[in-house]
Amino acid sequence: KSDVQFFRIVASSFVGGVFLTLCLVGCGKSDVVSSSEDEPNIDIEGNELVEIEPDRSLILHNPFTEWVTYASIGDGASTTYWSDYDNMHTSEGSVVKVSDYSNTLYLRGAWADFNPEDGVYAWEDECTTQASKRLKGFMEEAEKRGMKLAFTFVVDSRDKHDNFTPAFVKDAGAKGYETVTGSATVWSPYPDDPIFQKYYEKFIYALGERFDDPDKVQFISGTGLGKWGEYHTVWYYGTKVEGKEELPIRESVFDWATSLYADAFKRVPLLINFHRWIGTGRDWVNESTYDEDTERLIGKAVEKGYSLRHDAFGMHPYYGNWEREFAQKWFYKRPIIMEGGWVVGTHRYWTDSEGKYREGHPEDVRNGEFKDAQEAHVNMMDFRIGNETETWFGKSFDLVKRFVQEGGYRLYPSKVSLPTTMENNTSVTLVHYWKNIGWGYCPTNMPQWKNKYKVAFALLDTKTENVKFMFVDDKPEACDWILGNEKEYIF
C-alpha cells in the first residue's frame, strides 16, 4: 500500500460491475512517454478527456515533504509538550494542532541518552531512564497523530552542558578532549579513535535493526559528528595530538561514518549536512572562503544514497553564496530539507548580514527562512521547538499555510483521456498527464525509494470499491514531475 495520496478518476461508463480508477501505487507496462509541451495527444477514438483542478489547500501528509516538528528526550525537556503543541495560537486568532501541519517528529539528541550503557538502548522495555521514558512517550504520541519519526544522534559535547557520548566509551579507553560550556566541563571523543568507532558502530547497527522502517521513520540524519551533529569544526586525534595532515584523516572518518549509516539503514532515507567546511577542524572564516574538498566529499555521500540538509537557512552569511550554489547543483537529483539558523529568543538576529531583520520582529526571520527555502526548492521545512514554533504560528501563520500549498511536492493528474466504454478481451489506450504544483519534487530517484511509487490504473468493484484488476504503468517516474512542466504518458 502506498502512503502517497490517492487520486481517483471515475470513467463515465461502467463495465461488468467495475469502474476505472487512477492511483499511485507501490510498484507493469508503458508504450510511449512524451512531453506535453507540444500539442496534447488526446485525440483517441472512443475516449473522453477528463480535466482536473488541483486542491491546493488540502494537507496531504505525504512522505518526505511537509513541516518537521522537533522534540527532545534530554533533561530539561518540556513536560507540557503535547498540550502546548495541540493548542497552538495563530496570527489569525485561531487555535490549531501543530501535528495537523506536520507529519514528522524529529528527535535530535545525545548518543548517551539513546545508549546509556553498553548494550542498553532507550527504546527497549528493559531501559527505564528518564530519557527512555520520554522517547517511548514521544513514539507513542507520534503514532497516535500519524507522524513519522526522524533522528540525529549527536556525539560531540561542545556547546553542551552534559556529555553527549556515553560514559562507558570514555571508560573503555577512547581518546577524547574536554571543553567548557558555561560552568560545565564536558568530554567529547575524537572520531578517528578506534575504540570510539567500535562502540558507535555497535550503536548504529542496533538503531538500524529497530528503526530502518520507512512506515515509522521519515529520515535519519547522519553522521552525528562535529558541533551539534552537523559536521562542524571536527577535531581529530591524528591532527590535534599527533600533528598529522588533516585531509587523509578527515576523509577516512567521513568514509567510515557515511558507510556505517548507509549499511545500517537501507530502507529509510539518509541525510548529510552540506556547508562549506564539512569535517574540517576550523570554524567559519568569511563569505568568500571555503574548503576545496568539501563538495567532493559530500558527493561521495550522495553516491552512497544520502540526500541533503542544511541547518542555517535564513542565517546569513552562514547560508551564503557557496551554499546556494551547491544546492542548485543538486536540484531534483536529491531532495533538500532545511532547518533555520537563527534562534529568535536568544540570538541577535537583527545583525544578520543581509540587513533585512528588525530587532523585535521575529517574523522577519521567518520570512527570510521561507525565501531561502523556496529558492532551494526544499521538500521539508522546520518548526524546530519552543519559541521558533510559537513564532511560526503566532507571527507567520500565513507562511505555514503557504508551504502547505506551494512547498515540497503536490502531484496530481491534470488530464486523463479515458475510454467511455470497454469490452472484455479488448485493448484500450489511456493517456494521462501529470503536474507538480510544489516547488520541491517527489524523490523517487533516491535509492531507498527505487520503484516504490508507480502510477496504476485499476478496475474497482462498484459495490465494495475493492480492486478487481490493476495495471501498473512502469514508465512514468514521479521524480520527473517538476513545477512548471506537464508530463504526458500513453498507456
Model-derived segments and spans:
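Bacterial Sec-dependent N-terminal signal peptides
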Residues: 20-48
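Catalytic-core regions of glycoside hydrolase
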Residues: 44-91, 143, 221-229, 234-387
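Aromatic-lined substrate-binding rim segments of carbohydrate-active enzymes
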Residues: 94-179, 250-269
